[in-house]
């Protein structure tokens, strides 16, 4: 459903954000 898509997008965005932070450090 829509909620699962939102959760998947949030999880993906979270992983990308963590990877971005790791690259910055």
Swiss-Prot record:
GO biological process terms on file: defense response to bacterium
The keyword Secreted is annotated on this UniProt entry: yes
Pfam family, one: DD_K
Record's subcellular location: Secreted
Source species, domain of life: Eukaryota
Broad class of where this protein is predominantly found: secreted
InterPro entries with a match to the protein in the record: Dermaseptin_dom
Tissue specificity field: Expressed by the skin glands.
GO cellular component: extracellular region
Keyword Plastid: no
UniProt KW keywords: Amphibian defense peptide, Antibiotic, Antimicrobial, Secreted
SS bond list: none
Summary of the function given for this chain in its UniProt record: Antibacterial peptide with activity against Gram-positive bacteria S.aureus and E.faecalis, and Gram-negative bacteria P.aeruginosa and E.coli.
Sequence similarity: Belongs to the frog skin active peptide (FSAP) family. Dermaseptin subfamily.
Protein name, per record: Dermaseptin-DI5
